[in-house]
Amino acid sequence: MTRRKKIYEGKAKILYEGPEPGTLIQYFKDDTTAFDATKKAVLEGKGVINNRISEYIMTKLNSIGVQNHFIKRLNLREQLIREVEIIPLEVVCRNVAAGSLSKRFGLPEGQALPRSIIEFYLKDDKLHDPMVAEEHITAFNWASTQEIDDMMALTLRVNDFLTGLFSGVGITLVDFKIEFGRIWENDFSRIILADEISPDSCRLWDSQTNEKLDKDRFRRDLGNVIESYTEVARRLGIMKEMPTVIQGGLH
C-alpha cells in the first residue's frame, strides 16, 4: 500500500495529494470542534454523512452553473477535488438572526432578516476569525475588488439554491459559511466554490419546530448530533438510515 502525501490537515478534513496534477483527495474526519477548537469531540460517522451531503450539494450546484472544486466521491470518506488557491476568508450568508449576529446586534434568535446579509471573516483561529470589511480585504491583498464582487454574487446564488433545496424538505436555512479558491489558467484566475457544504457549515432548523439539525447541537450540548445530521441526509434522499459501524468500518 502506497503512503499518500498529506498536503494539509484542518479541524474536520485532511487534504492528500491527488492522482493527477491539479487534483487533491479530501478526507472527511469524525473530529468535531467549536469555539476555535477549544471544544473537541470525535463523533463516529460524522465524516461519512458530511461527505455524502457535500457531494450531493456540490453536484447540484455544478449542474446549475455554480462551479466548484468537487469532481467525484471516491468512497465513504473521500472525494476527489480540484486543487485551488484558497482565499483566506470565510464568507457567511445570513437569512435569520442567530449566533454571533444575534449577540452583536441584540436580535432575538429566529428573527427573519430584512434581506440576506453577507459577511467576511479572516480564516485565523489564533485571532478568532475576526470579521473584516472589504477595505481590509483589498488593502491586505487577500482578494481583489472584482474577486469580492464574484464571491458575493456566487454566495447569493448558492443561498438562493440552498434556501429552495432545504425548504422543499421542511428545513429552514438560517445561515451558512462557504469558502472560495482561485483556479489559474495561464496568467488569469477565476473564483470557484471550495471546501464543503454540510451541517457542519450551515445552520439548519426544522421548519415546523425550529429544532436544530446542525453543529449547534454540539456547540450547545443538545445531544443527538449524528442523528440530526442523518435526518438532514434522509430528508435530502441521500441516506435512509444512520450509518452503522461494522468491523471498524462505516456502512
UniProtKB/Swiss-Prot annotation:
EC top class named in words: ligase
PROSITE patterns linked: SAICAR_SYNTHETASE_1 (PS01057), SAICAR_SYNTHETASE_2 (PS01058)
Tree of life domain: Bacteria
InterPro entries in the record: SAICAR_synt/ADE2_N, SAICAR_synt_PurC, SAICAR_synth, SAICAR_synthetase, SAICAR_synthetase_CS
Pathway(s) where this gene product acts: Purine metabolism; IMP biosynthesis via de novo pathway; 5-amino-1-(5-phospho-D-ribosyl)imidazole-4-carboxamide from 5-amino-1-(5-phospho-D-ribosyl)imidazole-4-carboxylate: step 1/2
UniProt keyword annotations, A-Z: ATP-binding, Ligase, Nucleotide-binding, Purine biosynthesis
MF-aspect GO terms: ATP binding; phosphoribosylaminoimidazolesuccinocarboxamide synthase activity
Transmembrane residue ranges: none
Catalytic activity: 5-amino-1-(5-phospho-D-ribosyl)imidazole-4-carboxylate + L-aspartate + ATP = (2S)-2-[5-amino-1-(5-phospho-beta-D-ribosyl)imidazole-4-carboxamido]succinate + ADP + phosphate + 2 H(+)
Gene Ontology BP annotations: 'de novo' IMP biosynthetic process; cobalamin biosynthetic process
Entry protein name: Phosphoribosylaminoimidazole-succinocarboxamide synthase
Organism: Phenylobacterium zucineum (strain HLK1)
